[in-house]
Amino acid sequence: MAVTKELLQMDLYALLGIEEKAADKEVKKAYRQKALSCHPDKNPDNPRAAELFHQLSQALEVLTDAAARAAYDKVRKARKQAAERTQRLDEKRKKVKLDLEARERQAQAQGTEEEEESRSTTTLEQEIARLREEGSRQLEEQQRLIQEQIRQDREQRLRGRTENTEGKGTPKLKLKWKCKKEDESQGGYSRDILLRLLQKYGEVLNLVLSKKKAGNAIVEFATVRAAELAVRNEVGLADNPLKVSWLEGQPQGTVDPSPPGLSKGSVLSERDYESLVMMRMRQAAERQQLIAQMQQEDEGRPT
């Protein structure tokens, strides 16, 4: 990968939307999220998609290699410090600073800020060249995961359209758990926790927690298969089990199973979800009317 002047001037952390001290795992996760959204295969009408995707790939290579990242951070820090100093100076003080630096350059044989940044830039170029020679296995793996995710998304949408052609609409389940009305922790089940438990079975289109009845929620899945898996396998938290039952869209010939056990292999692993379902895109914006309708039905249903 040839280093470009553009790359040296870019803020790679801002490009990926991460903090400067982000760990490798956070860097890779941010890359997958950004790269998936701008992948050329998903943005054929965007002429800059390929360029941005390439920049993200370069950022991943630099920030996941310790030596290359250290060299880049040094360049970035020097550039940031210089910008901050320049910003604090008015025109008159800036002229004094420039005159002083000119005299220092004449008196000193080495060690100016410009030379230090130049040396750091050279080191960064060398590290990037080394990455090119060794081959970027991490980049190839991340791009493979993105391609796999795109394929999974397409198959999921096709399956969802096929399963829902009977005119029953999308499947909806009712969730119940023990929760006192004044319990601020909601019995241990927040919206984020419920989503984490349910999304491993398939795409969740909507999740509505009842404001009137504590310990009640309604979830809408994109496919019948995902809803069936959730009904069959999900048990919730060990200290406060979750009861999952059909509300709408139950296939004919099936019955609600008894509460499942925690047998090995009965629940999809978090690692499977992390690698294959992490980037699943929800369609919440188009379904606000359905959310309101479910809330009205839930509030009007007797306890």
UniProtKB/Swiss-Prot annotation:
Its Gene Ontology biological processes? negative regulation of transcription by RNA polymerase II; spliceosomal complex disassembly
Major place of residence: cytoplasm
Region Disordered, residue ranges: 78-124, 150-170
Q: Which residues carry this modification: N6-methyllysine?
A: 264
Q: Where in the cell is it found?
A: Cytoplasm; Nucleus
GO CC, one annotated term: cytoplasm
What would be an example GO MF term here? RNA binding
Q: Write down the Gene3D superfamilies for this protein, in alphabetical order.
A: 3.30.70.330, DnaJ domain
The residue ranges of the J domain are: 11-76
Q: Which InterPro entries does the annotation name?
A: DnaJ_domain, DNAJC17_RRM, J_dom_sf, Nucleotide-bd_a/b_plait_sf, Pre-mRNA-splicing_ERAD, RBD_domain_sf
Mind telling me which SMART domains this protein's record contains? Answer: DnaJ (SM00271)
Q: Which UniProt keywords apply?
A: Chaperone, Cytoplasm, Methylation, Nucleus, RNA-binding, Transcription, Transcription regulation
Q: Where is the RRM domain?
A: 178-249
> By its UniProt entry, which SUPFAM superfamilies does this protein fall under?
Chaperone J-domain (SSF46565), RNA-binding domain, RBD (SSF54928)
Q: Where is the composition biased (Basic and acidic residues)?
A: 78-106, 150-166
Lineage top rank: taxon: Eukaryota
A Pfam cross-reference name: DnaJ
Q: What role is this protein assigned?
A: May negatively affect PAX8-induced thyroglobulin/TG transcription.
Its protein name is: DnaJ homolog subfamily C member 17
Which gene name does the record give?
Dnajc17
